């Protein structure tokens, strides 16, 4: 492999391109400021606006979430294991159908493996912008995201609807299913 081909496999931190409309909770207050990064593999974004840095299918996906303080990622699940690596900040992870089955606080350098099929969410509880790396198994990133029913209901109240195909429709922008 030549130098140019190898350099095409590098994603530099300063070149990361966020998507602020990646998921069904993009308009829900408290979750509407998060940024999603799809770094390697197709990821699980529900938005056609998501930029994929390296689209190779290599058996797993690497993504990231960037969030300002007090911004949360809504309760969701995946069909494959998900591992989080805290890159920056302080984070509260919570789990269960309503997010009240348990919680843990993590800091920079901590790694957390969340079992398949458990609803989980997370919130930046630090005072600065925080970032997590997420690793999902499988080329299809587990077939997408499975949202807790209350997340889908909250999103609909704020204009976002998720089709059975996994595509996100924004009624505020006049999109119809």
Residue ranges and their predicted role:
Residues 2-9, 121-177:
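Double-stranded beta-helix
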Residues 50-55, 72-78, 95, 103-105, ...:
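Short histidine-centered beta-strand/loop micro-motifs
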Residues 44-49, 61-78:
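Conserved short histidine dyad/triad with adjacent acidic residue
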Residues 97-116:
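Short acidic-glycine-tyrosine-enriched beta hairpin
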Residues 79-92, 96-97:
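Glycine- and acidic-residue-biased ligand/ion/polar-headgroup-sensing regions
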Residues 1-59, 164-177:
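A short, N-terminal "cap"/entry segment at the start of jelly-roll beta-barrel domains
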């Amino acid at each position: 492999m030549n130098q140019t081909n190898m350099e095409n496999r590098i994603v530099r931190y300063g070149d990361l391109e966020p998507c602020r409309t990646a998921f069904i909770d993009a308009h829900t207050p408290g979750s509407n400021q998060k940024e999603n990064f799809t770094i390697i593999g197709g990821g699980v974004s529900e938005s056609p606006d998501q930029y994929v840095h390296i689209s190779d299918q290599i058996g797993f996906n690497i993504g990231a979430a960037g969030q300002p303080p007090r911004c949360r990622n809504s309760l969701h699940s995946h069909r494959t294991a998900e591992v989080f690596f805290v890159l920056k900040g302080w984070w509260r992870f919570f789990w269960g159908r309503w997010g009240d089955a348990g919680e843990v606080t993590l800091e920079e350098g901590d790694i957390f493996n969340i079992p398949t099929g458990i609803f989980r969410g997370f919130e930046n509880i630090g005072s600065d912008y925080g970032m997590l790396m997420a690793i999902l198994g499988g080329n299809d990133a587990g077939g997408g995201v499975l949202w807790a029913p209350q997340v889908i209901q909250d999103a609909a109240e704020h204009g976002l609807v998720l089709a059975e195909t996994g595509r996100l429709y924004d009624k505020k922008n006049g999109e119809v299913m």
